[in-house]
Amino acid sequence: MGHP
């Protein structure tokens, strides 16, 4: 969720 911290990355696309």
From Swiss-Prot:
Function: Catalyzes the oxidation of carbon monoxide to carbon dioxide.
Organism superkingdom: Bacteria
Keyword Iron-sulfur: no
Enzyme class of the recorded protein, top EC level: oxidoreductase
UniProt protein name: Carbon monoxide dehydrogenase large chain
Cofactor binding summary note: Binds 1 Cu(+) ion per subunit.
Subunit structure as annotated in this protein's UniProt entry: Heterotrimer consisting of a large, a medium and a small subunit.
Catalysed conversion reaction: CO + a quinone + H2O = a quinol + CO2
Cofactor: Cu(+); Mo-molybdopterin cytosine dinucleotide
E.C. number(s) listed in UniProt: 1.2.5.3
Gene Ontology MF annotations: carbon-monoxide oxygenase activity
Keyword annotations of the record: Molybdenum, Oxidoreductase
